[in-house]
Amino acid sequence: MGTETLLKIREMGREVKRKRQNEMVDYAYMTAPCGLPCFECYLYLAQFDEEMAETIAGVLGLSKEDTKCKGCRAEDGQCGHLAMECRVYKCIQKTGLQTCAECRDFPCDYLHPYSDQAMKPHNTKVFNLCRIKKVGLEAWAKNEAGGILDKYYYGQWTL
């Protein structure tokens, strides 16, 4: 995906969030068990903007409908854009926990980051879960989640 297209999608997502800023968000429901903020995801936001859905569909080679995700929990862990079943979702369903941050085995291998998936937000899961554990889900969702993704996609690495 080219930088120009990514920036266009980012701006579309910001516009969708601006239009929806007065709507209540159930952050617990809209945070995936693995710590991904579904409420910040471009695939979630695409359901509210047809042009955004078309742009993402073109980039990912998916149907427009498969780009419109309602969130991990609403999709029972099987978002249309994923070809595989989510092991994290299946695991958390068995435990009855809200997120992996609550699990005694956290972090486990299900949360392992992979470089071949670096353009997806999945490499932010462990960091998000650590922040949720430290500041609480609501504070993380309101104050940090969007910034973490922005920094991941658009920030510069520093030591």
Labelled PLM ranges:
Residues G2-L159:
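Cysteine-centered metal-binding/redox modules
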